Swiss-Prot record:
<keyword id="KW-0694">RNA-binding</keyword>
<keyword id="KW-0687">Ribonucleoprotein</keyword>
<keyword id="KW-0699">rRNA-binding</keyword>
<feature type="region of interest" description="Disordered">
    <location>
        <begin position="94"/>
        <end position="122"/>
    </location>
</feature>
<dbReference type="GO" id="GO:0015935">
    <property type="term" value="C:small ribosomal subunit"/>
</dbReference>
<keyword id="KW-0689">Ribosomal protein</keyword>
<comment type="function">
    <text>Located at the top of the head of the 30S subunit, it contacts several helices of the 16S rRNA. In the 70S ribosome it contacts the 23S rRNA (bridge B1a) and protein L5 of the 50S subunit (bridge B1b), connecting the 2 subunits; these bridges are implicated in subunit movement. Contacts the tRNAs in the A and P-sites.</text>
</comment>
<dbReference type="GO" id="GO:0019843">
    <property type="term" value="F:rRNA binding"/>
</dbReference>
<dbReference type="GO" id="GO:0003735">
    <property type="term" value="F:structural constituent of ribosome"/>
</dbReference>
<protein>
    <recommendedName>
        <fullName>Small ribosomal subunit protein uS13</fullName>
    </recommendedName>
</protein>
<dbReference type="Pfam" id="PF00416">
    <property type="entry name" value="Ribosomal_S13"/>
</dbReference>
<dbReference type="GO" id="GO:0000049">
    <property type="term" value="F:tRNA binding"/>
</dbReference>
<dbReference type="InterPro" id="IPR010979">
    <property type="entry name" value="Ribosomal_uS13-like_H2TH"/>
</dbReference>
<dbReference type="InterPro" id="IPR001892">
    <property type="entry name" value="Ribosomal_uS13"/>
</dbReference>
<dbReference type="InterPro" id="IPR027437">
    <property type="entry name" value="Rbsml_uS13_C"/>
</dbReference>
<dbReference type="GO" id="GO:0005829">
    <property type="term" value="C:cytosol"/>
</dbReference>
<comment type="subunit">
    <text>Part of the 30S ribosomal subunit. Forms a loose heterodimer with protein S19. Forms two bridges to the 50S subunit in the 70S ribosome.</text>
</comment>
Amino acid sequence: MARIAGIDLPRNKRIEVALTYIYGIGRSSSQDILQKAGVDPNTRTDELTEAEAGQIRDIIDGQMQVEGDLRRVVTGNIKRLMDLGCYRGLRHRRGLPVRGQKTKTNARTRKGPRKTVAGKRK
């Protein structure tokens, strides 16, 4: 099992798909990495030679922010917005949608389960 960026890649998948198991690498990024390394995207992970795995490792370590570093940057950006007190920061702080979505009926993912309020007595 190839281990790249601290992640065990699945053996039986194509290397193009297996690289997407690393946080911060999607399909297009994995295709770019494989093209730079000169590795065929259809190669299975267990068929990789040690030299090819080393090339992929060097490209990812040298040119990309992945896993813990990327998570730290993202949380730092959100924290910065919250400290600034800008609109986006306030939305993050309140746990509401940040990008202008309506909240009257939807936004359950951000708001969590409904807090039922008792109806008015007549």
